[in-house]
Amino acid sequence: MNLTTRRTEGTTWKDIAAQVAAGSLKVGDQIEDELLTGEKMVYEVAHITEDRMDFISRDTMAERFTWNENGRNTGGFKKSDLCKALNEKVWEQLLPEELKAVICERECIQVVDGEEEKIMLKLWLPSEYEVFGEEWFSDAKEGEQLEIFKDPRNRIKMGGHGGSRARWWLLSVNGGYSTYACHVNGNGYASNNGCAIDFRVPLCFSIKR
């Protein structure tokens, strides 16, 4: 049975970080909280390594985002409007200070035109390989499959709290195409689309163990 914890005045993110450090949480455990806008979020433990615990929201945020407004994937996720939006707008305007205080940077791998680059991010998205354990459109093994996504049902996300099935962006570019990036469709399958399209995104962050 998975644990569900509601973040309240009596259960702080500092307390949750202590549980992470102690190894008390397991993949699938949930933390309920709200953004500064009042939007409800449920964060799930998605993967555990020796040095960190990855959390990914059960469903996406309500807001939609383009991967890149100019319609191109040049420079990969690191240079994308989406990466900037997550690590500037979302980080600065939507996340509670208490949560930001316990988030650590995570090393993410992006491959663009055959060139691998490691980038450090506080808010990130999983790569296609991290979700599916296969390269469908990215043509690149970026990282390892996250434990929570080994169950295909967990690849399906709703658009906002209580919304309908959503298409959600991934970190990966579409291999061989300069205007496409990878996403997960409403049925939880690998897909691709133009970078200027607006899809939803989950909130993804890590806490140091």
Go through each PLM region and give its residues.
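Collagenous Gly-X-Y triple-helix signature in extracellular proteins
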Residues: 1-209
